[in-house]
Design a protein with these regions (language model features):
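Active-site anion-handling motifs in enzyme catalytic cores
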Residues: 1-167
């Protein structure tokens, strides 16, 4: 069985983010019939009910550690998670989740991400340093790819994909 953890802005009743999560889950289930999916979410009950997956609360640090430790991969997926316009705190939260997976020697994949804007100098350095260590970067548009290029992200190769909801 393949254990996948998905991190994103889920469990807040945002229609776009929930549609993104449904698309990611559907794609994973099509590709990996025996996949077990756990979502890091703001509302475990809602995520379980709406998506029929396992869930761990986004502020349950020990639960997140345990979940990632027993997984095969972390997918940071969908939406514009890596930006500091709405909140620098959220940027550092998502970077922390990815860093945690890397500390636990788990591959990290960015899936259909919209990147930026990331305005702070320290924030740009933090994004660059972390993303240079992930296994795969998939962005949803050319502007996101350019933002990563402008930040100095040189590896892994950045792939422009369709927004998961549209694919």
């Amino acid at each position: 069985m393949t254990n996948v953890v998905i991190s994103g802005y889920y469990g807040f009743a945002n229609a776009g983010d929930e549609a993104m999560l449904a698309a990611i889950i559907g794609s994973l289930q099509d590709m990996i019939p025996d996949v077990s999916i756990t979502v890091i979410t703001g509302n475990c009950a809602m995520t379980r009910e709406n998506h029929h997956v396992q869930a761990v609360h986004r502020f349950n640090l020990f639960g997140i550690i345990k979940t990632i430790a027993s997984s095969n991969i972390l997918i940071s997926g969908g939406g514009s998670l890596l930006q500091d316009v709405t909140s620098a705190r959220s940027l550092y939260y998502y970077l922390f989740i990815m860093r945690l997976a890397l500390w636990l020697h788990k591959p990290v994949m960015l899936y259909a991400q919209g990147i930026g804007p990331v305005r702070g100098v320290k924030a740009r350095r933090a994004v660059r340093a972390l993303l240079q260590r992930v296994s795969m970067i998939g962005v949803r548009d050319a502007d996101s790819k350019q933002e990563l290029c402008d930040m100095g992200v040189t590896k892994p190769p950045v792939v422009v994909t369709a927004d998961a909801v549209l694919s």
